Amino acid sequence: GSSMSKQRTRMTDIAARAQVSTATVSRVFNGVGQVSEATRAKVLTAIDELGYERPVLEPTSSVPNVGVILPELTNPIFAAFAHNLQNAIAGSGGVAMLRSQTPGATSELDHLESLIAHDVDGIIFVSGRHADYLGDLNRYQDLTDRRIPFVTINGARPEIAAPDFSTGDAAGIRAAVGHLAQLGHRNIALLTGRSHVVPSARKLAAFREIMSELFDVEDPLTAETFYTYEAAAAATGTLIRAGATAVVCGSDMQALGVIRALRDAGLSVPDDVSVVGYDDTFLMSHTDPALTTVRQPVNAITNAAVQTLFDAIGSARTLVHEDYVYNPDLVVRSSTAPMRPR
């Protein structure tokens, strides 16, 4: 007879053997509809006993695989995002496929190609090319064309057809400067990352705005460098020679570099110069002095990003560009103090 009737006979045999309806057998084969684990096991056992091939569609395929692409995990803020994203993805019933970039070796694009080859169901980008005004955006357009849903974290250019979830950099910088102003500081400097990256650009704009509002300073002291300890230490001298009594940094790593450079120059933190970090990463409450810093709401950001991505995976809805901003808190510790004339 035809293959259709052969298939029907097979279904009937399996149903009889497993003592379930043919509809249930069909659900197990097609992976569609609700089947209890016990029933699925009965059907699979019947298939094995009758010598038929098990369905290719194993139940695991209903678990979404979510790619997470981050910069290097040596920076504690990215480790924090990785940890929280992994938890949120697992909590939503998915599997996180973490990929971190290694400078000069594996790029965001390499990771992306490998995830697409692994039939990933959705992707979360953290602080990648999406946040770079000089970055090539073709990779994101390619994902949109392939209908692979993705979301971004911490800054995205408006051309990218995906929602971005980020820390309110403007609110964070305003809180830091406001705190220093209350302590009597006026010559406040901002040390941040490269301004072609969205969060740095937002920090710089907010800093210029509040320095103008509070002190009528139109060209405040700023320095742009990498988000590393060494780069920050190297940039510190210029700011201090220019008379800064307080430095707001774009990351905790930068703040630690600034504190080291100030100490090497024989200055005390916070007696001579106040320093504010940004991120409130692990161990910043244990530094000496304990670091006053802007705390990124990592948990709120990751939960919202994961929930939005899972909704898109489940509904095949097309995502569009939206900016979701989560305001940070200023955590006041011991690296800031009232201004003393130098």
Give the positions of each predicted feature.
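Hinge/beta->alpha junction and helix N-cap segments in small-molecule ligand-binding domains
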Residues: A38, L70-A80, L98-S107, R129-D132, ...
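Short beta-strand segments enriched in small/hydrophobic residues
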Residues: T22-S26, P59-T74, N187-G193
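Short acidic/polar active-site loop segments enriched in Thr and Asp
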Residues: S21, D121, R186-N187, T245
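Flexible loop/turn connectors
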Residues: V217, T238-R342
